[in-house]
Amino acid sequence: MPDRTVGADTAYPVTEALITSATAVLGVAPAFWGRYFSTPQTVGDVEYRHRVEDAVLAAHNIRVLPIARQTNNVGGGVAAGQRDGLANASDVIDTFGESYLVDQGGTFFIFLDVEGSGQSRLSTDYYTGWVDGLAQASKNVDLLPCVYGLPGDAATWTALARALAHGVPCSGLWMSHPLLTEAEPVAWNNALVAPKPDLGAPVLLWQYMFPRDGASIDRSLVNPAIHAQNDLLAFLIPPPVAQPNA
């Protein structure tokens, strides 16, 4: 199997022991780690906690993949999207510092978490507002809108396609189709990750496994059709060894 670029995501802080466990089950070190961002005021370990996580991730050259977390809001209107987009972007910028992010290139992906059931199905209006809210947070840092979702969530992909048709950007998709029995290393499978309907946005990542086999991480694989460094990792955030902000 060709070289694989893989990563993890969790709803709790990254530790040295967790990285060791993840590397053991993945077969290679994770190149990125997905963590949640919602608002600068949100507390709790579900959110990224840089005072705990920055140094350990930096020591292993693991980049942070920001996930925008307000799953029950994503079917709302433009105003809700604007509010959440501004809050998500402000959280990322306040966490790492605007000047630091500018020094690291100033342009990064952020993935909107759409779980594909109940209230968590995307609306065109919400996505349009969310993208606008992201852009309002800073004149110096660009957070590029991406979407995490389920391949079969037709309501979400239809809504996103409408937004794209009206010129609203989407920089990429992270598709969740977890496997239940397959062993590592897992190979990319286009048939399992294609959104239905297809909207033309690039599929960057496949979340192919939830916690199992003794590993308490979600696992994701980078699409081998893209250049992992240039097309994905360059747009994820390298955490600083030390950072003064809360």
Predicted regions and their residues:
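Functionally critical loop-and-helix segments that line ligand-binding/catalytic clefts
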Residues: 1-20, 25, 163-246
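Short, solvent-exposed loop/turn segments at secondary-structure junctions
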Residues: 71-73, 117, 152-154, 210-212
